[in-house]
Every structure is written in C-alpha cells, then in structure tokens.
C-alpha cells in the first residue's frame, strides 16, 4: 500500500511523523492499523485528496493544530 504513515502519541500531546516509512516498522509500534480509543499509540494512513488536504485512513480530516471537537474528541496536529 502506497502512502504516508504516521505514528502519533496523543497522550503526551506530541506527534511524530514518519514519512514513507515501512509499514512493518509501524506495525510493531501500534496494536491496530487505525485510531485506537484507549491505546497509547495510534497509527494512521495519510493520503492526500484532490484538494491537497490530508486525511486519515478512516477519512477523517487531519488538522494542523490541536482542537477540541464538539463531542470532546481531540484532533491531532499533523503537518506533512
């Protein structure tokens, strides 16, 4: 699968971007290949849409700043 993969630690309010890193490398660092609701590490598949905006594998938008959504979920800063 082509694309950019991103490993994010949301509990420390920090994020690490791994551009074009091997998927097997990230598999060892995350329990699942999608956002986890109660895990420490989160793995997201990053893909640019036709407008140049980046989206997670579950098609939620990737924001460029921390933000609290209306339902209380925290979005993650991602800048590629």
Over which residues does each language-model region extend?
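Surface-exposed loop/edge segments in extracytoplasmic proteins
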Residues: 13-17, 56-58
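Short, mixed-charge low-complexity intrinsically disordered segments
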Residues: 34-80
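A short, charged, amphipathic alpha-helix used as a generic interaction element across diverse proteins
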Residues: 18-42
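Structural boundary micro-motifs
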Residues: 3, 17-18, 27-29, 69-80
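Intrinsic low-complexity, intrinsically disordered segments enriched in polar/basic residues
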Residues: 1-2, 31, 53
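Intrinsic disorder/low-complexity segments in short proteins, especially the signal peptide
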Residues: 12, 28-31, 61
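Short aromatic-glycine-(Arg/Gly/Cys) micro-motifs in beta-strand/loop hairpins
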Residues: 1-13
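Residue-level signal for short segments within beta-strands and strand-turn junctions
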Residues: 9, 18, 45-48
């Amino acid at each position: 699968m082509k694309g950019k993969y991103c490993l994010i630690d949301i509990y420390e309010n920090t994020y690490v971007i791994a551009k074009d890193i091997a998927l097997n490398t990230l598999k060892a660092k995350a329990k699942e290949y999608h956002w986890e609701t109660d895990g420490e590490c989160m793995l997201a598949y990053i893909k640019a849409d036709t407008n140049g905006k980046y989206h997670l594998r579950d098609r939620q938008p990737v924001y460029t700043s921390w933000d609290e959504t209306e339902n209380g979920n925290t979005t993650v800063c991602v800048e590629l």
